[in-house]
Amino acid sequence: MIIPWQDIAPETLENLIREFVLREGTDYGSVEVSLQSKIDQVKSQLEKGEAVIVFSELHETVDIQLKAKF
């Protein structure tokens, strides 16, 4: 189930994105990117509709996925 990011309290959204970024360990190339920059990038993807927040009822987990997967 897709959860609209606008329906999530700002502090909760920030924590969700932070947890996602720390878990993913995304490779940003040879340039070091700050944690806040990574969080801002994911938030921007959510705002642009490029990424969505997904709740798995089966596993009772929340994740952020690229919208193209849905």
Curated annotation (Swiss-Prot):
It comes from the Bacteria. Gene3D superfamilies: YehU-like. It holds the Pfam family UPF0270. InterPro entries: UPF0270, YehU-like_sf. Belongs to the UPF0270 family. NCBIfam families: PRK04966.1. HAMAP family: UPF0270. This is UPF0270 protein VIBHAR_00073. It comes from Vibrio campbellii (strain ATCC BAA-1116). The lineage of its organism: Bacteria, Pseudomonadati, Pseudomonadota, Gammaproteobacteria, Vibrionales.
